Amino acid sequence: FRSNLDQRIRDLRKAEHEHPCRNCPDLQQHLKWGHRWARETRELQRVTDRYDSRTGSVARQFDCICDILTGLGYLERHVNAAGHIDMTLTEKGLLLRRIYSEHDLELCEALLAGTFDKLDANGLAAVLSSLVYEARRGGDGEPRHYPGGISGPIAIASSKLKGICEDIDILCEDHGLDEMQRPDFGILDIMYEWADGGSLGSCLYGTDMTGGDFVRTAKRLADVLQQIAVAQPLPFDGGERLAGLAHEAADRVNRGVVAYSGVD
């Protein structure tokens, strides 16, 4: 075995010595450039891999979000003089910029679609509570009952809001993004009673919700309502009325223990 290995080594050395490249007068220069090419190729691959990694995460998500916002009419793309693509906010985009919520896009779509037009202040607070409430325990995301019945304006507005959220989830899925958190209507009837002037004890009676969880949700809801109230001018018919309604709803929610509490 050793003799065969030695013979193979001798043969390889002979072949290397007799290789045509040995007669090239620029052999050393070619070797120098060959090593440089290999080094630059490795560096290019490293940079390419890093770019692909970034594109596959934050940058890719950003591009997908911009595509969704453009498709929904919140952004417009323009090609500038240098041939680069610039994006500008539309009138709808300016509204979205003034709303700060995990469900800001769903909320803007609902506002622009007139989802809340038939609601009073109590109903608006009740329906919008679904966008800020996060249940600690598993549930079906439905209230014990819909004030006004299943054919009333609150139930109808809730159904429309669910549909809007489902449509946006489909868009996210089509673009390879994670689904948005679904709205949870489990606190709807409780929040309605609170906005209607009920005491904390009577509103929570018969539920497993703690006072702290309710107050936390109510403060977040009041913040969203106040954002709508001051986001004028709202770019749709009835926007001024809805802004006033949101202001009234915020006052109805942010009262008593909710107003006094420092819970965020």
What name fits each language-model region?
Residues 1-264:
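Non-catalytic terminal extensions of ATP-dependent helicases
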